[in-house]
Amino acid sequence: MGQKVNPLGFRLGVTQEHHSYWFATNKQFAGFLEEDQKIRHYIYQYVQKHIRESSNTSYGYSGVSKIEIKRDTELIHVEIHTSGFPALLIKGQIKEKNRDKNKSNKNSALDQSVNKNQNKNTGQELEKMWRYVQRSLTLSNGKFRMTLSKVSNPYKEANIVAEYIARQLENRVAFRRAMKQAIKDAKENGQVKGIKIQISGRLNGAEIARVEWAREGRVPLQTLRAKIDYCHYPAQTKYGVLGIKVWIFQGEGWT
């Protein structure tokens, strides 16, 4: 049988970078690694929990792309690469006002007020998440800082695309329709070179589990210089768990 290696680990140091940046002794390494996994777990858990509790259902391509952790002697710095924060966590999205250079002073003041409210809500939600992680963990370092980094193009991020498909499946959208829509959005808005999506499990409630996949463009898994983003994500449906895999070919190059 064919053996498939993880596309991200296969390209680590070539086109992929590490998500944890720190040095440790042999005794510290296992503890730091476990702590990093717990930090990521609790952040993802917080986001998913509040998405389900929120009254807002039209998240689109919003979610967490990746979480980078940097350690200093006295500080743990967690950088969350995300799209749609904090609108995916709070009830009632803040609608962004269209900007125009020829607006009156009144409209300009209104825009400033909207931006001020957005920054205020972002800070509040980030602080809530920080407190949640602090309560859930006993961190080795005393200081713990969390910052946000906005994803420039969410359609090129495999994690965000997989989360979008999972939400569609959990809302009982047909799996083929969800796959085709995600591929169309990635090709048109993400300007990706290729994308492949695979869904496995009891599709449409069938008694026998099967695997379905769709691909558009090139996805060269054996080319090391190919920048490929990959994600495996579970979807909790009425008939059981569906496994979603997404490969996105972003282009060629070296880190």
From Swiss-Prot:
The lineage of its organism: Eukaryota, Viridiplantae, Streptophyta, Coleochaetophyceae, Coleochaetales. It holds the Pfam family Ribosomal_S3_C. One of its GO terms (cellular component) is chloroplast. This is Small ribosomal subunit protein uS3c. Residues 96-121 are annotated as: Disordered. Residues 51-124 form the KH type-2 domain. Part of the 30S ribosomal subunit. GO terms for molecular function: rRNA binding; structural constituent of ribosome. NCBIfam families: rpsC_bact. One of its GO terms (biological process) is translation. Belongs to the universal ribosomal protein uS3 family. The keyword Glycosyltransferase does not apply. InterPro entries: KH_dom-like_a/b, KH_sf_prok-type, Ribosomal_S3_C_sf, Ribosomal_uS3_bac-typ, Ribosomal_uS3_C, Ribosomal_uS3_CS. It is found in: Plastid, Chloroplast. Residues 108-121 have a biased composition (Polar residues).
